Amino acid sequence: MGTIYLFRKTQRSLLGKLTQEFRLVTADRRSWKILLFGAINVVCTGFLLTWCSSTNSMALTAYTYLTIFDLFSLITSLISYWVMMKKPSPTYSFGFERLEVLAVFASTVLAQLGALFILKESAERFLEQPEIHTGRLLVGTFVALFFNLFTMLSIRNKPFAYVSEAASTSWLQEHVADLSRSLCGVIPGLSSIFLPRMNPFVLIDIAGALALCITYMLIEINNYFAVDTASAIAIAVMTFGTMYPMSVYSGKVLLQTTPPHVIGQLDKLLREVSTLDGVLEVRNEHFWTLGFGTMAGSVHVRIRRDANEQMVLAHVTNRLSTLVSTPTVQIFKDDWARPVLASGTMPPNMLNIPEHHVIQMPSLKSTVDELNPMTSTPSKPSGPPPEFAFNTPGKNMNPVILSNNQTRPFGVGYGTTPYTTTFNQGLGVPGVGNTQGLRTGLTNVANRYGTYTPGQFTQFRQ
């Protein structure tokens, strides 16, 4: 025979895998728009950072960080398209929807870290306020505002759209909602615009641009440079307050928690499942949020022994699928068994007491050397060995024969009871002795309890 050579598949590097997945995404024309906006965002961010350096404005730098956040949101939208194209694999049986959650969580946390950096730099500037040049401050403000709004309203970002609606409202949204109610009380026609929950990203873009416009006017009129630092702190606080609820919501999804508003509906579904035909018990239920708008869960269902497993499984899955997109149901039948009762008459000899009781002394030999018949391996003792179980005189003692002193009829004597074999392999076998005035119909007397045969009753001669 010739030599057999094993050919292994060449493992691609990380860069090669990323290139392959990027080609998969770019095959869809819907992703071209995202890539175009991403390229424009990089160019726009470069210009804004240059203007931040020339104007020496911390407020414009804080506002530019929102443009960088837009780039993260575009990457998240691109990941969302990739997740839609990928199918579940044996390693990731639930799919790749959690990557969307991870992208949203990372983007919001990075935005909060940028806000903290702005707060730290602004605190240092309060001690020594530099001069602010307003040459390109207003131009940079409107360029950033236009691009941020155009990106948010043109690109359909499914993950961030869901998070902005599902997460709790930020303090900025609550204050704007209060002002909108007051304004709509004066002008009712604006209720259709201001009363609904405003998009938090659009709101922070408008609020940041408004703060920069106030900064520009105060510096141009009074050369009040400290207002730039105050505006930077205001934009950083608004950024942190807007991103914090989204990061909390996406973090809870990553921790596989159950949303509070779904717990009542899940309890109702489980009660309905427990009332299905053949279902005895529903236990070990666990439900969690798999992605944005999708839930997964597992449940164990105990059914009757005569129930149809496939039928019960279909009914349970149908009930749970109304709320849980990926349910996992494990069916197992009831293992309770009734004790087997003996039918028929009981033999009369079962109640007879033998002449002697043979009591086997318990063996004090360690059970470590004994084999378990189920596993064919030495079984471990269930408890610690006795304290004085080693080298004791009664370790290999033979059985003890205890006489049974039963009451006999008057006038019947006790004959001697010779033994054919005194001790035979640890069992005493008594013989039949001669009795005075006693005639029996047995040729062999049984030596174990419960082995007597009918006709062994003694007869007495008058």
Swiss-Prot record:
It comes from the Eukaryota. InterPro entries: Cation_efflux (IPR002524), Cation_efflux_TMD_sf (IPR027469), CDF_SLC30A (IPR052005). It is a multi-pass membrane protein. GO terms for molecular function: monoatomic cation transmembrane transporter activity. Coiled coil: none annotated. It is found in: Golgi apparatus, trans-Golgi network membrane. GO terms for biological process: zinc ion import into Golgi lumen; zinc ion transport. Its main location: Golgi. The chain crosses the membrane at residues 34-54, 65-85, 99-119, 135-155, 201-221, 224-244. GO terms for cellular component: Golgi apparatus; trans-Golgi network membrane. Keywords: Golgi apparatus, Ion transport, Membrane, Transmembrane, Transmembrane helix, Transport, Zinc, Zinc transport. Residues 1-33, 86-98, 156-200, 245-462 are cytoplasmic. Residues 55-64, 120-134, 222-223 are extracellular. Has probably no intrinsic transporter activity but together with SLC30A5 forms a functional zinc ion:proton antiporter heterodimer, mediating zinc entry into the lumen of organelles along the secretory pathway. As part of that zinc ion:proton antiporter, contributes to zinc ion homeostasis within the early secretory pathway and regulates the activation and folding of enzymes like alkaline phosphatases and enzymes involved in phosphatidylinositol glycan anchor biosynthesis. PANTHER family: ZINC TRANSPORTER 6. Belongs to the cation diffusion facilitator (CDF) transporter (TC 2.A.4) family. SLC30A subfamily. Heterodimer with SLC30A5; form a functional zinc ion transmembrane transporter. This is Zinc transporter 6-B. It comes from Xenopus laevis.
